[in-house]
Amino acid sequence: MYNIDTIKKIDSQLAEAIELEVNRQRNKIELIASENFVSDAVIEALGTPLTNKYAEGYPGKRYYGGCEYVDIVEQLAIDRAKQIFGAEHANVQPHSGAQANTAVYFAFLNPGDTILGMNLAHGGHLSHGSPVNISGKYYKVVPYGVREDNCYIDYDELRKTAKENSPKIIVAGASAYPRILDFKAFREIADEVGAILMVDMAHIAGLVAAGVHPSPVPYADVVTTTTHKTLRGPRGGMILCKQEYAKKIDSAVFPGNQGGPLMHVIAAKAVSFKEALTDDFKIYQQNIVKNAKALASALMEKGFKLVSDGTDNHLMLINLTNMNITGKEAQHKLDEVCITCNKNGIPFDTQSPFITSGIRLGTPAVTSRGMNEEDMKEIADLIHLTISDFENSRTNIIRRVEALCNKYPLYE
C-alpha cells in the first residue's frame, strides 16, 4: 500500500490533495474507458530512487556512466514486452502514447507527407491527425470514418480513400471505437498503396496481451500503445516494430523526440508487464469484455441507444439523442451521484465537441476492483435513474453507489 507520511510532514497541502484524489477513486464508480487502477507493486516502482538516474541512450549504449543497473531494469521491460506481444523489437522509453505516435511519424515522414487516420469525430485520436494536434499541423491528413448506417469502419471507403491519396502511413486505432479492428484488411490496403501500417492499440493493449482481441503485431509495421489503460501499468508509452525498423524507431525516440528516459516509470512498466504474463491477467481481461457486454446489454434493455448497437471490447458509446440530454449534462449529473465518465462525440454528431451527444463508458477500472456482470446490471440501473429521474432518485443512487464501492474496496 502506498505511503505518503513523509509528504505529510513536508507539504501538508499536497498531501491533502493526494488523499482527496485517492478517496475520490475509492468512493466513485470509475467508468472512464482510458483509466484503470494499478497494483501496489506498480505504485512502489514509481516511487523508487531510480528517478534520480539519467540514462540517455539504450541498454549497453548510454551517454552517462553508472547505468549498469538501470540497464537491467530497461532490458527486463523490453524483453517482457516482446514476450507479451510476440514482437521483434520494443522501445519502452516513450513518455506517453502521443509521444510514441509522434516518434513514429518522425521516423517515417517528412513535413507535408500524407497520413490516413481515423476521424476524431468518428472515434479516432488527437494524435492521428487532428488539426489542433502537431500531427495535423506538420503533415497532410486525410481522415477515414465509419458507416452512417451501422457505425462500423467502412473498409471499402477506406481503400478508396487510400488509393486516391497515396498516404505514407495508414494509422489503425481509435479512442472511442467499440468494435474489433480488422488488421488484415488494414494490411491489405496498406500494401495496395505502398504505405507503412501503424497500429495504435493504446486502448486495447491489455485485451491483445491476453488474446481477447486479435493482435496487430503480425500485420503492422509498427505498433504504438500506452502502458496504462487496459494494460494496467504506469502512465507511459511504448513502440513495437519489426526488426528492420528498430534502428529508425529508436533514433526517432532518442535523440529525435526525447532526452533522458524516466527510469522509475520504466521500472513500473517492467512490473506491469510481468503481471501481464500471468494467468490472472488473462482472466482479468476476459472479465473486462464480459462486463462491457453485460453493461451494454443492460443499458440497451433500459432504452439507451449504443453506437454500433453494442461492443466487442472494453468500451461503449451511448447515443443520448433520444434521452433529451447532452453528453455534457449527463457527465455532470453522473458525477453528482459519484459515477465518473466522460462526455464524448458520436459519429455524425450535431453537437460541438464541448457539448456532445454522447458519453463513453468503459469497464477496465471497475473490473480491477472485482466487479462482475451482476454489478454491471446494477450500474446500468443507476445510470438510467440518473438520466431519467435525477431529482427524485439522487439520494438513493448515491447510497447504492456507496454500497457498491464498499463491497469492492480500493487501496486499503
Curated annotation (Swiss-Prot):
The record marks 228 as: Plays an important role in substrate specificity. The modification N6-(pyridoxal phosphate)lysine is found at residue 229. Its main location: cytoplasm. Its cofactor is pyridoxal 5'-phosphate. Belongs to the SHMT family. Catalyzes the reversible interconversion of serine and glycine with tetrahydrofolate (THF) serving as the one-carbon carrier. This reaction serves as the major source of one-carbon groups required for the biosynthesis of purines, thymidylate, methionine, and other important biomolecules. Also exhibits THF-independent aldolase activity toward beta-hydroxyamino acids, producing glycine and aldehydes, via a retro-aldol mechanism. This is Serine hydroxymethyltransferase. PROSITE patterns: SHMT (PS00096). It comes from the Bacteria. One of its GO terms (molecular function) is glycine hydroxymethyltransferase activity. (6S)-5,6,7,8-tetrahydrofolate binds at residues 120, 124-126, 352-354. It catalyses: (6R)-5,10-methylene-5,6,7,8-tetrahydrofolate + glycine + H2O = (6S)-5,6,7,8-tetrahydrofolate + L-serine. Pathway: One-carbon metabolism; tetrahydrofolate interconversion; Amino-acid biosynthesis; glycine biosynthesis; glycine from L-serine: step 1/1. Its EC number is 2.1.2.1. It holds the Pfam family SHMT. The keyword Lipoprotein does not apply. Keywords: Amino-acid biosynthesis, Cytoplasm, One-carbon metabolism, Pyridoxal phosphate, Transferase. The lineage of its organism: Bacteria, Bacillati, Bacillota, Clostridia, Eubacteriales. GO terms for biological process: glycine biosynthetic process from serine; tetrahydrofolate interconversion. It comes from Ruminiclostridium cellulolyticum (strain ATCC 35319 / DSM 5812 / JCM 6584 / H10) (Clostridium cellulolyticum). It is found in: Cytoplasm. GO terms for cellular component: cytosol. NCBIfam families: PRK00011.1. PANTHER family: SERINE HYDROXYMETHYLTRANSFERASE, SERINE HYDROXYMETHYLTRANSFERASE 1. It is an enzyme of class 2 (transferase). Homodimer.
